[in-house]
Amino acid sequence: PVRVRHIPLQIRSTFRPDLPGTLIRTRHDGASGIAGFAGRRRMAMLRIHGAPPGAPAEALRALGEEPFCLSETLGQTTVLLDMGSGAETATLAARLRAQLPGAEVTLRENLAVLAAICRTSDAIPPVLQAVESAGVPVHHLLRCAPGLLMIVNDSQYETALRSASVSK
């Protein structure tokens, strides 16, 4: 009945009723360029500098690893992985260093992926600006029109999501 009659729902937290919550509408009013958000927590990121193109992906395959995301740009490879235990990701970083001699492999743990699905690419800059204005550092950014993936600290995921969701 709510969908049929186009009745908006206001969802609020039982624990924080003073907060505005989330308004869910059945129709798009055109005011927001954001279609929605998705996220994934407890991620780790490996950055690899100085390896030949394609070598990090080949090394990961040889080690039997399936990354969540792998991107290569200007001599840098960024690999996102489910964190698992800290020991597992640290061991993987050490194994990659052995597989890729001469390459610099750095590991960052306790990250989250926040994806903004945008209706147009014009909505991307305000989302990024809102997240950064909230004091959330974006460690890696992948633009994939119309949307983007932002890698943020896991502890700041909720702040990033709240900031992005109110961006204009």
Each language-model region and where it sits:
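C-terminal catalytic "cap/lid" subdomain
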Residues: P1-K168
